[in-house]
Amino acid sequence: MSDVAVAETPAVKTPTKAPKANATKVPKVKTAAAHPPFINMVTAAISSLKERKGSSKIAILKYITANYKLGDQVKKINSNLRSALKKGVASKALVQTVGTGATGRFRVAEKTAATAKKPTVKKAATGEKVKKTVVKKTVAKKTGDKVKKAKSPKKIAKPAAKKATKSPSKKVAPKKAAAKPAKKTAALKA
């Protein structure tokens, strides 16, 4: 009888776990979004709104919800919009004219619009880039020569009469006056 008991125990041990049939899972197919990435929607909204001081987050949100299928999850839409605005400002694709973070007003950066047009030109003429850099270097050398020429007349003017020394000071004063309005216009543009 002990032999029978031994024979039964191996029978119990033999049913080991078979490989799972679930191991061959069907990969989940991701459904394509019904809308483009949020940063693209934001730039499209800002460019179409054409507000002088820039577009607010609320105006951008209204435009996006009216023109794209986003669903009913308002909290997700707001969080995605906020993150898109912050990333756009960080990557310099957007310029924040007023406010901080996701509040305030936003404009599309002028550089991004210019760079979007330039890549087609750059692809066609890659050899011209090298020539342009060479031209820039020669221009820099010429400006150095002009500075040297400007210094030599000043040395000649010093031994001259006192009237000659007064005239350069008059020239300096108008340059400062001209520089101040330029700063004001730069501040007004920004």
UniProtKB/Swiss-Prot annotation:
Chain segments carrying region Disordered: 1-29, 141-190
Keyword line: Acetylation, Chromosome, DNA-binding, Nucleus
Location, primary (coarse class): nucleus
Modified residues (N-acetylserine): S2
Matching PROSITE patterns: H15
Disulfide links within the chain: none
Superkingdom of origin organism: Eukaryota
GO molecular function: double-stranded DNA binding; nucleosomal DNA binding; structural constituent of chromatin
Start-end of Basic residues biased regions: 148-183
Gene3D superfamilies: Winged helix-like DNA-binding domain superfamily/Winged helix DNA-binding domain
InterPro entries, alphabetized: H1/H5, Histone_H1/H5_H15, WH-like_DNA-bd_sf, WH_DNA-bd_sf
H15 domain location: 34-110
Keyword Nuclease: no
Record CDD domains: H15
Subcellular location: Nucleus; Chromosome
Keyword match Disulfide bond: no
GO cellular component: nucleosome; nucleus
GO biological process, one term: nucleosome assembly
Low complexity bias spans: 9-29
Pfam families in UniProt: Linker_histone (PF00538)
Family in the record: Belongs to the histone H1/H5 family.
Function in brief: Histones H1 are necessary for the condensation of nucleosome chains into higher-order structures.
PANTHER family linked: HISTONE 24-RELATED, HISTONE H1
Protein name from the UniProt record: Putative histone H1.6
Native source organism of the sequence: Caenorhabditis elegans
